[in-house]
Amino acid sequence: MKKNTDSEMDQRLGYKFLVPDPKAGVFYRPLHFQYVSYSNFILHRLHEILTVKRPLLSFKNNTERIMIEISNVKVTPPDYSPIIASIKGKSYDALATFTVNIFKEVMTKEGISITKISSYEGKDSHLIKIPLLIGYGNKNPLDTAKYLVPNVIGGVFINKQSVEKVGINLVEKITTWPKFRVVKPNSFTFSFSSVSPPNVLPTRYRHYKISLDISQLEASNISSTKTFITVNIVLLSQYLSRVSLEFIRRSLSYDMPPEVVYLVNAIIDSAKRITESITDFNIDTYINDLVEAEHIKQKSQLTINEFKYEMLHNFLPHMNYTPDQLKGFYMISLLRKFLYCIYHTSRYPDRDSMVCHRILTYGKYFETLAHDELENYIGNIRNDIMNNHKNRGTYAVNIHVLTTPGLNHAFSSLLSGKFKKSDGSYRTHPHYSWMQNISIPRSVGFYPDQVKISKMFSVRKYHPSQYLYFCSSDVPERGPQVGLVSQLSVLSSITNILTSEYLDLEKKICEYIRSYYKDDISYFETGFPITIENALVASLNPNMICDFVTDFRRRKRMGFFGNLEVGITLVRDHMNEIRINIGAGRLVRPFLVVDNGELMMDVCPELESRLDDMTFSDIQKEFPHVIEMVDIEQFTFSNVCESVQKFRMMSKDERKQYDLCDFPAEFRDGYVASSLVGINHNSGPRAILGCAQAKQAISCLSSDIRNKIDNGIHLMYPERPIVISKALETSKIAANCFGQHVTIALMSYKGINQEDGIIIKKQFIQRGGLDIVTAKKHQVEIPLENFNNKERDRSNAYSKLESNGLVRLNAFLESGDAMARNISSRTLEDDFARDNQISFDVSEKYTDMYKSRVERVQVELTDKVKVRVLTMKERRPILGDKFTTRTSQKGTVAYIADETELPYDENGITPDVIINSTSIFSRKTISMLIEVILTAAYSAKPYNNKGENRPVCFPSSNETSIDTYMQFAKQCYEHSNPKLSDEELSDKIFCEKILYDPETDKPYTSKVFFGPIYYLRLRHLTQDKATVRCRGKKTKLIRQANEGRKRGGGIKFGEMERDCLIAHGAANTITEVLKDSEEDYQDVYICENCGDIAAQIKSINTCLRCSKLNLSPLLTKIDTTHVSKVFLTQMNARGVKVKLDFERRPPSFYKPLDKVDLKPSFLV
């Protein structure tokens, strides 16, 4: 039998992308783009940003200038490894230093004279501390010689106190396509942003808006707040491009529907009316008058010529070095899109489309912060020079200003969850599953405030542009992040590019475009504009567009431009544009190439025989036309076939319509979804729930769990899954394990395992089945004098402390034990007291319900004593703990049964877990049964024909029929035992066994589904969720229980709880809980006249309202709760009067008694 058929070739090519590619420097594919992004920043971009020479101040017509120069930028890696940082409890940072020189330049007749003002050679070990990204194998970009730890995938920052931090990738707010908006009927706006190229520092941003109102076409203006004049868009285009209005009319009308042509004519006519309304109209004079008016309006200190130069030169910063004529043609192309979008809005990429957005990776976060903080640093120096000159008449800078760049605080805030002051981007990594080291850095999310502010935003829906590039299963199912965070598919990555590479690539592309005949790339009237990163460079002959794009794609794949991730998009549909994208932050993934109706994979006969010995980069080099890296914009405007199978079923004419072909369905899932099994065989919601539960599964031990004082939950005896996918294997998820194999039975057990209830075997627990260890960090800060005080009275809370005031190592802490000495003392002002010193314990107590062993203690002595304690606890499954399969069959332990209580098979084997059999039908998880069947088949034949151990490949999403898996299981059993009868073979294939009742030892009537499966333990543990207590801490204001388990909180008893007890008739219980306890009892005097609470003045209760009116009302004492008194007081303070009134009814003894007739009834 042939090892690999043609239909498997696409799958094998997809697998090649997932595995490491050392020839291309890819050692861990899932996070490679993050490593490259960060290394580009710290090795290259940081030097470019910090190396500055520019004027701070200028005087006397720019003949005297105060200059600043920052040079000698040096980045030094730490001397120790990440594990040493964890042991020390320190952060893992690189040190950046630089030299600052501030001098005065004076232009004289002899030349320029330079006078030194101030300088600072930064050698401070805390000048700029940059958190280092720890890559695969504990490596960092600055020191790749660190020892390799293969199973440590990295992708984290170690923040202060050895806490790991990871973050998601945010969608950039600036869009690469203008945003179309309907303001009101017949009124529209078209807004866009222009950002200078990466080689221009500091980065310049401009935001423009084109407005159009059908009722006032003369006011079709472009404007920008304080950076540009408000001018008619058609006249501005004419001014820049130096063409006639008829030229603009023909350019806008070319290849447009009739309704758009009608609007074009109306707009051009309105522009003509403006020109005709002005005598001797001249376009230059018209623009100059508008600039002068804006100059007067802004009260600018610049001269009119300088003001005009600044405004027009900085117009469209992304085309900074482009002639004005090309800027004018670019404005015409924008107006063309705008007019078309008015009538055909659905065909234009909306603002939520990923086509319009770039994505911020780790390196871009640090780059943006470095930009902002450097500008703040230079601004502080400028202000300090101005203040010193104003106050003392000298140009001087305080050394404190020079030595505080501010980057440390910005980077620290970034790792604490704040990006650009208000936008949250990072979160602390939860240590119950290191799978989130993969999932979080590969997540893409929107700014939270971006969604709240914009009423038009509809990203909560799965946008069509996310198809293939994002995992449709791994999305938040509930909460505020629904629809705002998406997981990249396994083939997707985010582009990175150095500034030098960017400039070289731009130069090569421009040279290629200019190699065409000059007239063919100068069709500015009716041609297709060619843009590089939105900057117009040429306009192509419409008859050559297909040949140009095809040739460009071929050259790109062959490495002609030196970059295989260049995106080229042919935008048709009347918008007519060729967009070439080379920047960072684009989503890219590989596709199979279709050229002239042929799948190029099929045209290369040598590929199949050589594929096993090649890496992905080898395929791109030796067979360049088989696979193409395509960005999301190119994909959106291309014709892509869904699968190779569908492509081969088409006719030849149909095939010629396609440009690309996709890989099999399993490559559309993310890495978390790839840990599931057969989600396409289940109902839809199971995939979303399964991804959420897989990230909550407790994984194996971390490499330095005992050194790291941090919270974590770790599986003690993990097992590698038998049924896996290729993505699960290449991402190291399978090798690092996140569960155990257990034997399950699908049946009912005495009515106990109803709904989500499961039965678990006691002996399975005792043997360490799904046993975990919990690591917990406890941190306290104690004033030094309190720590040094000695306790005067022996306290049980201090029984676990050493003489040095710290908890003993290996001590078992119980609830109420102190972790460090904290004794507050106070002196009484009593001359007659023998001992006027009193002391009391104020230490923070251990509050968990379970005992924990002290593993590690760290102390830092500053003005306060900072004590950090790491406790460890082995925790076996108990009632209420949650478990799940990889098909989202979550269950809660309902009963722990002894082995003697459980049914057994003919070999005496009892199930480890019994699951309710009806859950399969209600949740429709057929793939769970398939997983059991495949795992059991593996146990029958765990080795392939070469004697090698082979796991079973069962991808998360697959196009394989269930019959194929049944056939595989049949072959396994027939190989191990060829003498089985048909009935016995069928029972083994479908895992059906006869079980025996443990009480009667008689077989059950029906066969039971019985077999092994990979089972996960979730982080939802019963003892971590229990917060019920009767006594403990209370808040000072309302004297009720604290909120939150971490703060020792309890149940807050309020109105709803009261209503529940009323419904049960528990009046006495309400009185006891709400009023009768010592702390909550409150005597209150109420004025019977106005209903106010009486005030106590010098031990006399009086009603303030009535006393001012000289009234003497009756005060009645009532007993109530303290919470009620606080509520009434706060309502009164807010101007809300709450009147307490008394029920008016006469006493019962004032009523005359009814007459009683004592005569016998028979006499009546």
From Swiss-Prot:
Top-level taxon of the source organism: Viruses
Annotated Gene Ontology cellular component terms: DNA-directed RNA polymerase complex; virion component
Localization, UniProt: Virion
Gene3D superfamilies cross-referenced by the UniProt entry: 2.40.50.150, 3.90.1100.10, DNA-directed RNA polymerase, subunit 2, domain 6, RNA polymerase alpha subunit dimerisation domain
GO biological process, one term: DNA-templated transcription
EC assignment: 2.7.7.6
Functional note: Part of the DNA-dependent RNA polymerase which catalyzes the transcription of viral DNA into RNA using the four ribonucleoside triphosphates as substrates. Responsible for the transcription of early, intermediate and late genes. DNA-dependent RNA polymerase associates with the early transcription factor (ETF), itself composed of D6 and A7, thereby allowing the early genes transcription. Late transcription, and probably also intermediate transcription, require newly synthesized RNA polymerase.
Name of this protein: DNA-directed RNA polymerase 132 kDa polypeptide
